[in-house]
């Protein structure tokens, strides 16, 4: 281990505890795009003159697509309950959870709330490490905070910042607003 001084030791300990309870969530939505007929671009006289009449005129048929999503979640029940953001799992056909120990599980969506952007999912596992909830009413502007997640699918990433504001409202994100604002780096895939 590196010796960066005593000041960093609490952050190392907190990071270890938090990372054990933060999971990577991969989601898939399957859909079929219907045929839309021939593309008018290929029927353009200039295009036909350049490529010739023998250019194959195809009518695209239905195609299957897989839309993939990434996010993070926090284990809140040792029996497999995980809290994430609603937008991570909303409308998805498959949700897969990867634990820090590299085990993967198919997850079941238990409940979602689009207004607060919160969702609960469950995996079939037991004896999982649980991250305890804090008391947001005790937070103060200027306190240091850590954010743990899977930005861009890079698992177990920890960033640090301070609490910039508490009780933030009127930002137009969701109907219910009482946000904690931080300057800790939050990237796509950290949601959850």
Which residue ranges define each predicted feature?
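Serine-dependent protease modules
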Residues: 1-192
């Amino acid at each position: 281990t590196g010796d960066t001084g005593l000041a960093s030791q609490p952050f190392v300990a907190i990071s270890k505890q938090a990372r054990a309870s933060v999971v990577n969530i991969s989601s898939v939505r399957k859909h079929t795009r219907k045929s839309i007929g021939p593309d008018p671009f290929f029927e353009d006289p200039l295009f036909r003159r350049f490529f010739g009449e023998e250019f194959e005129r195809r009518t695209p048929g239905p195609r299957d697509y897989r839309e993939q999503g990434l996010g993070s979640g926090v284990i809140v029940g040792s029996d497999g309950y995980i809290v994430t953001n609603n937008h991570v799992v909303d409308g998805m056909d498959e949700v897969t959870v990867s634990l820090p120990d590299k085990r993967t599980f198919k997850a079941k969506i238990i409940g979602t709330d689009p207004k607060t952007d919160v969702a609960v999912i469950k995996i079939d596992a037991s004896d999982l490490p649980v991250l305890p909830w804090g008391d947001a009413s005790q937070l103060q502007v200027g306190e240091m905070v850590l954010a743990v997640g899977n930005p861009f699918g890079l698992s177990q990433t920890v960033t640090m910042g301070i609490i910039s504001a508490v009780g933030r409202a009127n930002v137009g994100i969701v109907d219910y607003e009482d946000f904690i604002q931080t300057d800790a780096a939050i990237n796509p895939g950290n949601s959850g």
